[in-house]
């Protein structure tokens, strides 16, 4: 039997000014699902990096489209960011992705190339497909055991 989930799909122009719309939508979805604040912030960074990579690399001078699909499962949020633009040599790029030498001064860190490293670090799972264009599938699981209700109410009323 197939696992039940809900799907939200969005298409936006591959322009930097539209990335915030995706980020805000994802934050709203994750909040409604019950994700912790820190996990939502991590996912906002990851989705921003994925979309920014598309904007910068997929379409060169042309304006293309970013397709975002959110898969809402009981225990996780799956986020797919896809383009139909020019793909790049993924294996070459992957070999250059972190970890970075913490003993080197920050001035020696590359200006670009941290995106995939950040996504991989912040998300629970990441898959990248690069046939026609590029598709990044990111997964974050809900950590429900972080805050527990102990059943003892707190009162701000002071009794004398």
Curated annotation (Swiss-Prot):
Molecular function via GO: ATP binding; protein serine kinase activity; protein serine/threonine kinase activity; sigma factor antagonist activity
Catalytic activity field: L-seryl-[protein] + ATP = O-phospho-L-seryl-[protein] + ADP + H(+); L-threonyl-[protein] + ATP = O-phospho-L-threonyl-[protein] + ADP + H(+)
EC number(s) stated in the UniProt entry for this protein: 2.7.11.1
InterPro entries hit by this protein: Anti-sigma-factor_SerPK, HATPase_C_sf, RsbW
UniProt keyword list: ATP-binding, Kinase, Nucleotide-binding, Serine/threonine-protein kinase, Transferase
Signal peptide region: none
Ribonucleoprotein among keywords: no
Pfam families tied to this protein: HATPase_c_2
UniProt keyword annotation of Membrane present: no
Entry's family note: Belongs to the anti-sigma-factor family.
Function of the protein: Negative regulator of sigma-B activity. Phosphorylates and inactivates its specific antagonist protein, RsbV. Upon phosphorylation of RsbV, RsbW is released and binds to sigma-B, thereby blocking its ability to form an RNA polymerase holoenzyme (E-sigma-B).
Name of protein: Serine-protein kinase RsbW
Species of the source: Bacillus cereus (strain B4264)
Lineage of the organism: Bacteria, Bacillati, Bacillota, Bacilli, Bacillales
Gene label: rsbW
